[in-house]
Amino acid sequence: MSEAQGFDALASLSSNPEAAAPAVQKIDAQGRAYATGKRKNAIARVWIKPGKGSITINGRDQEVYFARPVLRMMIAQPLQVTDREGQFDIVVTVEGSGLSGQAGAVRHGLSKALTYYEPGLRAALKPHGFLTRDSRVVERKKYGKAKARRSFQFSKR
């Protein structure tokens, strides 16, 4: 085999990573798919299984835990994109950060759990960015500054 053929084979492998890894369901003994999602300092652990569509977050219903409709809409986005609303019972434990960060973490975890349960859904979720970890976190405070970037008030005289 010549060098050119070897490089062509390597190029085809690296350009299409999805072809190298076959899609396999990741389901536990109870028939659930599990995934973790993260956003800011929030970490969500998500379990999904076929059911009537109930969403339980930290032992409470989603309407109670996330009172703002915008946050509930954020969580439902992966289900709407994949047309799986009302088909899965979802149990979530989430901690850290605020409500907005927690909702983002739940959305990330739910998207990953859906792809573990049905690997074919990855193509629908990936373009919307639901499988990508949002790496933006709060910038740290620096010494000699009031906040991360804000300086103390300057007095000329």
Curated annotation (Swiss-Prot):
GO terms for biological process: translation. Keywords: Ribonucleoprotein, Ribosomal protein. It comes from the Bacteria. GO terms for molecular function: RNA binding; structural constituent of ribosome. InterPro entries: Ribosomal_Su5_D2-typ_SF, Ribosomal_uS9, Ribosomal_uS9_bac/plastid, Ribsml_uS5_D2-typ_fold_subgr. GO terms for cellular component: cytosolic small ribosomal subunit. Belongs to the universal ribosomal protein uS9 family. HAMAP family: Ribosomal_uS9_B. PANTHER family: RIBOSOMAL PROTEIN S9, SMALL RIBOSOMAL SUBUNIT PROTEIN US9M. This is Small ribosomal subunit protein uS9. The gene is rpsI.
